[in-house]
Swiss-Prot record:
Keywords: Antibiotic, Antimicrobial, Cytolysis, Fungicide, Hemolysis, Secreted. This is Nigrocin-2GRb. Antimicrobial peptide active against the Gram-positive bacterium S.aureus (MIC=12.5 uM) and against the Gram-negative bacteria E.coli (MIC=3 uM). Has antifungal activity against C.albicans (MIC=50 uM). Has some hemolytic activity against human erythrocytes (LC(50)=40 uM). It holds the Pfam family Antimicrobial22. It is found in: Secreted. Expressed by the skin glands.
Length: 21
C-alpha cells in the first residue's frame, strides 16, 4: 500500500546517501 511505497522510497534515499547500496 501507500505506507510500503513510502518506506521503499525512504530506503532508496538512505541507501543512496549512505552509499551502502
Amino acid at each position: 500500500g501507500l505506507f510500503g511505497k513510502i518506506l521503499g522510497v525512504g530506503k532508496k534515499v538512505l541507501c543512496g546517501l549512505s552509499g551502502m547500496c
